[in-house]
């Protein structure tokens, strides 16, 4: 599984964040996971080896983005346009971005987004029914070509039938 973490750290916003693995792991090393920082691998999608080939090669599986953060954090606003540019440049890769912050979507889009980039899937992360009922209706209104729902961490049974009937959700993880 290919992972690209352009920034690290997050701010807890819901019950699904209470036992966040990033906070636990960072605490083991004496780090504060609530401090958002750009990573050394920020430019991973466009890094090349000595032969001039991309280090991150196309695979059958997509590149998962921000597994130790949230792509739409306001603290990452200053870096996001550069991240979008790398995503656009690497049309040979498929990127999956999961978020609990669909409410920041329009504040964080590149100017040429239109109906979405063909190589980007956005997953709306939900953990309890109340959050699903809050986030998914707003998420369904967003201009995204490839939409999915991520049930993680799953804290209770979710009923998603009404959202799946729209035909806009391509996958539920």
Where are these regions (language model features)?
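Local cysteine-cluster metal-coordination motifs and their immediate loop/turn environment
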Residues: 6-26
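Conserved AdoMet/S-adenosylmethionine-binding subsite of the radical SAM
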Residues: 42-173
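Residues that flank catalytic or metal-binding motifs in active/ligand-binding sites
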Residues: 13, 38, 118
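Non-heme iron-sulfur electron-transfer modules
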Residues: 25-45
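Short Cys/His-rich Zn2+-coordinating modules
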Residues: 1-4
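Short, glycine/acidic-enriched capping/hinge loops at junctions between secondary-structure elements
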Residues: 21, 29-32, 75-77
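Residue-level detector of secondary-structure boundary/capping sites
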Residues: 8-11, 33, 74, 130
């Amino acid at each position: 599984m290919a992972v690209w973490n352009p920034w690290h750290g997050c701010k807890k916003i819901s019950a699904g964040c209470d036992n966040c693995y990033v906070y636990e792991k960072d605490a083991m090393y004496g780090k504060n996971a609530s401090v958002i920082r750009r990573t050394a691998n920020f430019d991973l999608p466009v890094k090349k080896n000595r032969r001039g080939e991309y280090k991150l090669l196309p695979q059958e599986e997509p590149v998962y983005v921000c597994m130790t953060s949230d792509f739409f954090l306001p603290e990452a606003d200053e870096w996001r346009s550069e991240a979008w540019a790398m995503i656009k440049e690497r049309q040979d890769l498929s990127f999956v971005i999961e978020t609990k912050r669909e409410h920041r979507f329009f504040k964080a889009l590149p100017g040429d987004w239109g109906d979405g980039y063909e190589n980007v899937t956005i997953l709306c992360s939900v953990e309890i029914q109340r959050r699903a009922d809050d986030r998914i209706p707003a998420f369904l209104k967003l201009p995204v070509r490839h939409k999915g729902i991520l049930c993680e961490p799953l804290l209770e049974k979710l009923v998603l039938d009404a959202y799946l009937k729209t035909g806009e959700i391509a996958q539920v993880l």
